[in-house]
Amino acid sequence: PEIGYFSLLNIESFIDYILLQELSKNVDAYRLSTYIYKDKESIDNRIYAGPIWDINHGYGNCNYGETWLTEGWLLEYNPEGGDQISFWWELLWNDTNFQTLFSERYQDLRSTIFSDNYINGIVDSITTHLGPSIDRNFSRWPLLGNYTWPNYYVFDSYEEEISYLKSWTSERLRWMDSELSTQITGDINLDGSVNVVDV
């Protein structure tokens, strides 16, 4: 409390990390499969979040932790039992200044790489690139129409999976829009404005 976390963390990396984990609603976020790192002091003495990895149980593809639902903050879902979210994630999340910067960053990304058109374009591009390997994959591993842990839905075709991914992501973004449309005010460096570059 005396020093504050802004001098200890690269805030931009934590904001982007949380935004991506919340967009995907990745059940392994914050509690498992989480990387943070620090360079040597001569380069930067702050802690960075990332890289993101292991999102196979994200985007509505998991039947526990309420991650199939498009609403709700994953960071706020912390039931009793194993695999608890570490307390410091909650402290960061509940900080007014962090929330303001988080909301601003989301608004910036929503008009670019978080736009529905951009995301659907990436999905379509990857699907096209994979081409015939999709059929070969399911020929080798006949998973379509069969339950595989911990999938929430069982799809009969790859096209159904792609449609679900796009629909789920779009609905998730609608919910995030509703939550982040009003920015929380905060002034990190007491200069009368709040901006990511001030961090």
Residue locations for each model-derived region?
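Residues in Ca2+-coordinating acidic/glycine-rich loops
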Residues: 25-27, 189-192
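Alpha-helical segments with a strong preference for the paired helices of cellulosomal dockerin domains
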Residues: 191-199
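Middle-to-C-terminal accessory/interaction subdomains
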Residues: 1-31, 37-39, 44-184
